[in-house]
Curated annotation (Swiss-Prot):
Pfam family, one: NADHdh
Membrane topology: Multi-pass membrane protein
Protein origin, superkingdom: Bacteria
GO terms under biological process: aerobic respiration
Subunit comment: NDH-1 is composed of 14 different subunits. Subunits NuoA, H, J, K, L, M, N constitute the membrane sector of the complex.
Name this protein carries in UniProt: NADH-quinone oxidoreductase subunit H 1
Protein EC: 7.1.1.-
Coiled-coil ranges from the UniProt annotation: none
Function: NDH-1 shuttles electrons from NADH, via FMN and iron-sulfur (Fe-S) centers, to quinones in the respiratory chain. The immediate electron acceptor for the enzyme in this species is believed to be ubiquinone. Couples the redox reaction to proton translocation (for every two electrons transferred, four hydrogen ions are translocated across the cytoplasmic membrane), and thus conserves the redox energy in a proton gradient. This subunit may bind ubiquinone.
Chain's gene name: nuoH1
GO CC terms in record: plasma membrane
Main location: membrane
């Protein structure tokens, strides 16, 4: 019993180290990818100077960021100001614990995996609010308040769309949800829920056209206006890591997880299929960011409360009724 417990602890520690390393490398790659996507959309090549096709540009920028001075303004709440970037980044990492990268490639296959991810995502918003308030800056505080309002508005339809999938599988365990999509992905059975999830996930990650909390033309840099160096870098790491998490969840819920299309894997390992789908969804979010203009805050709120929430609620009710009729037959 003791030997098994020790092995489990070693497995957990190794998994946490891998998660931490992957999250850093993944964020570096996504920054480079976004620069390239933005460049292509704007008819330019993007960064090309450092490394082949600019691959090392992000690494050099990271080294430069680490060397930047950590400035703490006199008027801030010092302890909360320093703690906020860490509090933003840490809850995002929890999502990696329950993500099903492949058959058996789940660090913790919990029966409340979905609930865990969305519960901890709330802490990120609280950390953003703490950082905005502690900065003692009107732009930072206004950006943080906008972030809270946006999160509340879009968390509701996001959870309603997820519940539509949970009803179909009768489980919150990611492995069971992915296993149920061995032949047909849920995006074909729940197209409305899948589309709503992607819209809400884009808003949850504060990406354009929903980047109201960081609107440069209005709020300088939003809630991280006063941050410099790696404190500023942690906010960016959290943003890109969170973008990976929400798209990985979309892959698990709607796009078959580690399964290939219609049950055919074409000889590729499950983890490869999982990453391909996740990065394709990330590309779509980046494409939307660099294609559509930012909407106003009142438009953002109206879109959620008057359209997304009613539609997602109707979709959930229809799903429940259809499943009940199937059971009766």
């Amino acid at each position: 019993m003791g030997h098994e417990g020790g092995t489990e602890w070693v497995r957990l520690i190794v998994g946490l180290v891998i998660i931490l390393a992957f999250s850093q490398l993944n964020a570096l790659f996504l920054v480079w990818l976004e620069r390239k996507v933005a460049g292509r959309i704007q008819l330019r090549p993007g960064p090309m100077e450092v490394g082949p096709h600019g691959l090392l540009q992000t690494i050099m920028d990271g080294i430069k960021l680490v060397g930047k001075e950590l400035i703490t303004p006199r008027s801030v709440d010092r302890k909360l100001f320093i703690l906020a970037p860490v509090l933003v980044f840490m809850p995002v990492l929890v999502g990696f614990l329950v993500l099903p990268f492949g058959p058996g490639l789940i660090l913790r296959d919990m029966n409340v995996g979905i609930l865990l991810i969305f519960s901890f995502s709330t802490f990120t918003v609280l950390a953003i609010l703490a950082g905005g308030w502690a900065s003692n800056n009107k732009y930072a505080l206004l950006g943080a308040i906008r972030s809270v309002g946006q999160n509340v508005a879009y968390e509701i339809p996001l959870l309603l769309t997820v519940m539509s999938v949970v009803l179909m599988v009768n489980s919150m365990r990611f492995s069971e949800i992915v296993a149920a999509q061995g032949r047909v992905w849920f995006i074909f059975l729940q197209p409305v829920a899948g589309l709503l999830y992607l819209i809400c996930a884009t808003a949850e990650t504060n990406r354009a056209p929903f980047d109201i909390p960081e609107a440069e033309s209005e709020l300088v840099a939003g809630f991280h206006t006063e941050y410099t160096g790696m404190r500023f870098g942690l906010f960016f790491l959290a943003e890109y890591t969170n973008m990976f998490i929400v798209t990985a969840v979309a892959t698990s819920l709607f796009f078959g997880g580690w399964h290939g299309p219609f049950g055919f894997d074409f000889g590729l390992p499950g983890v490869v299929w999982f990453l391909i789908k996740t990065y394709v969804l990330i590309f779509v979010i980046m494409w939307v960011r660099w294609t559509f203009p930012r909407i106003r805050f009142d438009q953002l709120m109206n879109f959620s409360w008057k359209f997304l929430i009613p539609v997602s609620l109707v979709n959930l009710v229809v799903t429940a009724v259809v499943l009940k009729l199937i059971d009766l037959n």
